[in-house]
Each structure stands twice: as structure tokens, then as C-alpha cells.
């Protein structure tokens, strides 16, 4: 996990040149060539312009954050069951609760499973299956067990489970 992924934050590719601090970006004059875009401070609150990063009353942080980051702040996503932050919290809690998801051993080795085009499926040990729809359309997969966690709403029917586009589901088998 890299800074901001737990909030669903993208890399900022349009930092104004006058705010660049990374030597690669400064020398090239191109924000996309430096590392500043992935170093923009995390938004802790919904309060612009610094979104809780810095002392109370701050008017600027060391790199400017996009205006839309307030709605993706820790404060905005905390407690929202549909947020990326709560998905990560749930996934980490699941991993702590299920020893099989910890360090790989001979009993918990990852095994790739057959899956439809655009879908990755793997088993971890004898207890878990993960299905990931990398496509831009919903995909139907066999139901391998009990749904534990999903990144989007999964519809389960007798013919299989439908994974929305760009989603993942974790199953107990």
C-alpha cells in the first residue's frame, strides 16, 4: 500500500511548476517526470486548503492538494461503508482474523484458478479464494464459497456471482 491508496487518491499530475520540489520535476519542468505527484500530503479533514495537514490556520502545505480531495479525506471516508478507507480497514481486519492470510507456508500457498477472460482468480491455502474483475464490464464467476468482503456490490445467484467492473471479492471456501 502506498500513500493515499487507502483513500483512493490518484497521483497528482498537474502540480503547477512553481510548486515543484522534487529535483527531477524541477529540472525537467514537467510535474509528471518528478515524484511530487505521489507526495502530496494526505487529506485528513475536509477543510481546504491544507485539509488538516499542518498547524491549525495553515494556508498552504508543502505541496498543493487538488480541490476535490476534501471529499476523499480521512474525516469524510471514516465510517462510510462504501469508501475506500473502510474497504482497506475491513481487509486488514479480515487478514488479522484469518491466520491463513498471513505469511505464506506450504499450506497457504497461492494457486491460480481458471477464470473467465478479464478475471483473475486464486486460492490461498484451503480456505480462501479471491476473484478480481479487471475488465470494464461485469463478469460472472462460479460462487466459490461465502462472500467475506468485496470492493463493490457483488450479486450472487444460482448461476454464479456477478462482479462489477474493476472490483474484487474475497470468499471463504
Write out the residue ranges for each language-model feature.
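Residue-level signal for pocket-adjacent positions within structured domains
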Residues: 37, 69, 149-151, 158
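A short acidic, often aromatic-flanked loop/helix-cap motif at beta-alpha or helix-coil junctions
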Residues: 49-50, 154-157, 168
